[in-house]
Each structure stands twice: as C-alpha cells, then as structure tokens.
C-alpha cells in the first residue's frame, strides 16, 4: 500500500543522505525497493501469532531498539491495531526514544474523533508527528501541539519512473486508468464505473482500465456486467510497475472518499499523464491545479465526473495543455526536495 511504498522510499532517501537505516517489518512482506538492514518480526508473526507470540515480539522489538541505540525512530505503521498493541509499542517499546510518527491516511481523523483522549495520550511523547499533507496537519492541530506537527509529503523519483516506463507495453487501445486498492469504503470506485458508463466515451474507443487488487473486485465486475459495459472495462492485477500503465493512459482518475496524500496522482503526473480527482478533504487540492495539470471536481456527482471524462477525452488541446504542465507541476514533491525536509527535521530540531 501507500504507507509501505512511502516507508521504502524514506529508507532510500535517508540512506543517500548518509544515515544508517534499519527497517523493522511487522508483516513478512517485502514488495518495494528499499535500502537498509531488515529486522523481520513478520517471520515470527507467521510462526506464532497467538497472544503469547505478540508479547514475545513486543519484547524482542524493544530489545532490538535498545541494542542498536537508535538516534531516531520513524513509525510508518497505520496504527489500526488493538489498544493493547498500541500501548505496548507507543508506551513500552518506544520509551525514551526519539519517535517520529507518520500519519499516512485521513482515516486517522475518524479514528481520533472516536477516541480523542486516547490518541493524544498514546502519542503524547512524540518528538514529531509527520503528516503527509498540509490538510492533515491543519486538522490535527486541534489535538496535538502545533510545534510537534510537521508536513512532509511523500516523494516521487521522476528519473526512476521515467526509466521503468520505457519497458515494452502492448495495450492496443486508449484508456482511462484507476490504479489502487479495490476497497469501496475508501476508493469509491463504483462512482467511477457509473460515470464512465454514463459518459459513453467507450463509443470513441476509450476503455476503463482498473489496475489493482482487493476484496471488492467481484462487486465491481458484477456492476460492470449489469451496466452492459463488460467489453469496455478491463481488470488488471497489482504490479510493481504501474507507471507504464500511467504513461500510456489518457488520464488517471481518483474518486476516493478520503486520502492522506494520494501518491498515485503525483506518480501519474510524473509520467506526464493528467489526472482527474474529486477533492476529498486532504490531498488532491495540494497536487492538482484545476485546468492546469488536470481536473479537480468539488462534488461526488456522477454527471460532473462523466463530463470531466468526456472533456479530457474529446478536447485534444485541453489534454495536451495538461500533459505539458504535468511533470513541472509536481517538482515540489521530487526526491531532493523531500529529502531536505527529512534532513531538516532530523538534524535541526
């Protein structure tokens, strides 16, 4: 997911800045390129995930931190586990360490509103709370000390993306792209499918390509069948290189109910491909300049999204303008700029 990808990118940035990086894996899964020394608690989790197993891993985690005498800990976990687990990590494992907690998702807003005091207490000793968008930072000001909150967006490595997009690619049709998790509660993909059907851009040979995996795929396939657009909608599985799909798309679309920092939009723009997104509370408005590098919609309105799909498909001058502005528009999120933000926080505070 996005948090794992961001953590992997952090490991590469910090290694290039000269820091010795260790990565503690909570789950035994490595998908993205990284730099650093791996300590894999996930292997132990696979062998024994009982209550006793969890207690043992908590003690081992604490011992690993103490043995290595780390100067700083960057916690990229989503922190959606049970209360006992969070108390064990925040109040025991991290005790007397300099900890930077990264808040990746706006879903944290709902969680914190459910248990305001608890969230404040768990992170009360935080050295910094890093938010991946300015909107998230502003929201969290009501719960945490403003001096503790810092916005550091997720980075994108444009040169590396350009390199991998040069791979052979053999999709013979034009398409609108969705790239992400098939999770309706967050991603709101039914709206995109309905708007695509309503737009009738398939009559001009433009398909809808849904790239990803998740529990809701079957529901989307059923919706596509019911709308009689199955021959115009393609489902493709998760790939480590979604960028080649982004490069050849007409546009990448995001209809999420919430995001922290929708990296997929930045990655698409890095590929030179415009974006269409609904302006959920945090994220899209910090990336998209409406009618400059894409279209930023203000409501979850099917007709409005259908019109946006028609506009970007049919108006070649508009599409070419967005393409021309795409890469330049995301320079503030480049590898060097975001690396400097991390260096500043780690060394000057």
Predicted region positions:
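N-terminal strand-loop element at the rim of the active site
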Residues: 1, 5, 9-55, 141-143, ...
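A conserved mid-protein helix/loop that constitutes part of the nucleotide-sugar donor-binding site
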Residues: 4-9, 183-198, 208, 215-221, ...
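Short His-centered aromatic/hydrophobic patch
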Residues: 75-85, 103
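Conserved donor-binding/catalytic core segment of Leloir-type glycosyltransferases
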Residues: 168-187, 193-196, 323
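Active-site donor-binding acidic/aromatic loop of nucleotide-activated sugar
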Residues: 216-219, 230-239, 245, 295-296
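Aromatic "clamp/platform" in nucleotide-sugar-dependent glycosyltransferases that forms part
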Residues: 257
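Short hydrophobic beta-strand element within catalytic cores of glycosyltransferases
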Residues: 274-278
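Conserved acidic donor-binding segment of nucleotide-sugar-dependent glycosyltransferases
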Residues: 279, 289-291, 295-302, 311-316, ...
């Amino acid at each position: 997911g996005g948090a794992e990808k961001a953590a992997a990118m952090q490991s590469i940035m910090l290694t290039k800045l000269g820091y010795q990086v260790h990565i503690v894996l909570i789950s035994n899964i490595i998908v993205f390129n990284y730099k650093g020394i791996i300590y894999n608690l996930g292997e132990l989790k696979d062998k024994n995930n009982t209550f006793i197993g969890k207690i043992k891993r908590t003690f081992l985690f604490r011992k690993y931190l103490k043995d290595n005498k780390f100067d700083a800990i960057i916690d990229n976990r989503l922190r959606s586990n049970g209360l006992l687990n969070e108390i064990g990590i925040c109040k025991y494992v991290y005790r007397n360490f300099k900890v930077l907690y990264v808040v990746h998702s706006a879903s944290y807003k709902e969680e914190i509103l459910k248990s305001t005091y608890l969230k404040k207490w768990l992170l009360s000793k935080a050295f910094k709370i890093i938010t991946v968008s300015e909107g998230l930072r502003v929201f969290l000001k009501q719960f945490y000390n403003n001096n503790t909150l810092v916005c550091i967006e997720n980075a994108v490595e444009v040169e590396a993306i350009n390199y991998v997009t040069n791979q052979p690619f053999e999709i013979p049709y034009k398409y609108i792209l969705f790239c992400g998790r098939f999770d309706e509660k967050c991603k709101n993909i039914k709206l995109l499918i309905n708007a695509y059907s309503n737009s009738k851009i398939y009559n001009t040979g433009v398909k809808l390509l849904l790239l990803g995996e998740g529990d809701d795929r079957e529901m989307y396939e059923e919706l596509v069948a019911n709308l009689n657009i199955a021959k115009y909608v393609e489902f493709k599985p998760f790939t480590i290189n979604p960028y080649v799909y982004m490069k050849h798309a007409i546009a990448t679309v995001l209809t999420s109910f919430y995001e922290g920092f929708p990296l997929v939009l930045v990655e698409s723009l890095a590929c030179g491909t415009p974006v269409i997104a609904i302006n959920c509370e945090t994220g899209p408005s910090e990336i998209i300049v409406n009618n400059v590098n894409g279209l930023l919609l203000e409501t979850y309105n099917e007709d409005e999204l259908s019109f946006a799909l028609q506009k970007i498909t049919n108006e070649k001058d508009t599409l070419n303008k967005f393409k021309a502005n795409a890469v330049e528009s995301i320079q503030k999120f480049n590898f060097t700029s975001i690396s400097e933000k991390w260096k500043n926080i780690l060394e000057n505070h």
